[in-house]
Amino acid sequence: MRILIIEDEQHLAEALGQIMAEQKYQVDLVYDGAEGLDYGLSCQYDAILLDVMLPKLNGFEVARRLREARVSSPILMLTARDEIGDKISG
């Protein structure tokens, strides 16, 4: 399985990547929304872990653009935000 992690906190991204690599997943790590969008559009991923608060493009915008481009990979949103509006948007 190939997983894309889009997370701007490098230590968290690397920890998630290490855990998944130990489980034999192939992992790509990127640290901003624009680069994450490029990766998501250029490769077929089995899942995308996507932070909401990202530099350049936020996670909601990345998810919207991926869906507009008909990328069908499951997207799992990561966030510490707990507002109802954020949950609805995600």
Task: Identify the role of each PLM range.
Residues 1-90:
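N-terminal/domain-start alpha-helical segments
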